[in-house]
């Protein structure tokens, strides 16, 4: 029996050649849990570079009031 390695997810930002942006808060909501926490790389499928940049942009959107800090 041959066991194949699972296919790697391709980072959507690398694929589309763009960067995460705090002004696109509707898209950033996809990377938050129901409680408002930032999802990890395994769940988002992003590369390390874009995961770090995504976290910075989510925090920036929170400071501007575009995203909630905590969802109750």
UniProtKB/Swiss-Prot annotation:
Task: Print the keywords alphabetically.
Answer: Ribonucleoprotein, Ribosomal protein, RNA-binding, rRNA-binding
A single Gene Ontology molecular function, please?
structural constituent of ribosome
Looking up Pfam families in the UniProt record yields:
Ribosomal_S18
Q: Name one GO biological process term.
A: translation
Q: Which SUPFAM superfamilies match?
A: Ribosomal protein S18
Q: Does the keyword Ribosomal protein apply?
A: yes
InterPro entries (alphabetical):
Ribosomal_bS18, Ribosomal_bS18_sf
Q: Which family does it belong to?
A: Belongs to the bacterial ribosomal protein bS18 family.
Q: Note the PANTHER family from the entry.
A: 30S RIBOSOMAL PROTEIN S18, SMALL RIBOSOMAL SUBUNIT PROTEIN BS18M
Record-linked HAMAP family: Ribosomal_bS18 (MF_00270)
Protein name in UniProt: Small ribosomal subunit protein bS18
User: What organism is this sequence from?
Assistant: Aquifex aeolicus (strain VF5)
Q: Which gene is annotated as encoding this protein in its UniProt record?
A: rpsR
């Amino acid at each position: 029996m041959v066991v194949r390695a699972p296919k790697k997810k391709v980072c959507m930002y690398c694929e589309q050649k763009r960067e995460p942006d705090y002004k696109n808060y509707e898209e950033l909501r996809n990377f938050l849990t129901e409680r408002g926490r930032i999802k990890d790389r395994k769940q988002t499928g992003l590369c390390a570079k874009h995961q770090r940049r995504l976290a910075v942009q989510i925090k920036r959107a929170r400071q501007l009031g575009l995203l909630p800090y905590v969802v109750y």
